[in-house]
Amino acid sequence: MSLQTVLVVDDERDIRELLTITLGRMDLQVDAVGTVAEARRALGERSYDLCFTDMRLPDGTGHEVIELIADEHPDTPVAMITAYGNVDAAVSALKAGRCMSVKHRS
């Protein structure tokens, strides 16, 4: 049986490492990237069982990642994580696709 795969998209290295370690302990295979462009490449190479994406990225937004996944991999659930969350952003993310929003401390 192959491991389930998770894509983590966050520009903060510490967050990527934390999620990689935590999800790895749950026997999940993790690919972690820091930009929308890197996420686009990763999504072009494989399908994922789950995606965590930050809201603000250096070359775009988590909404772009959600749209990519909704268009190319509509069965993949997405969780948006951010230190800048608000209700409007969460509603927008939910409307964009299969997504939940989680606020983390900065």
What are these regions (language model features)?
Residues 16, 58, 86:
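The feature encodes the CheY-like receiver
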Residues 35, 61-64:
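Acidic catalytic/metal-coordinating carboxylates
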Residues 47-52, 57:
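Active-site beta3 strand of CheY-like receiver
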Residues 27-38, 42:
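Short hydrophobic/Thr-rich beta-strand motif most characteristic of the beta2 strand and flanking loop
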Residues 13-31:
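Two-component/phosphorelay signaling modules centered on CheY-like receiver
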Residues 41, 63-75, 92:
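Short amphipathic alpha-helix used as the core "switch/output" element in two-component signaling
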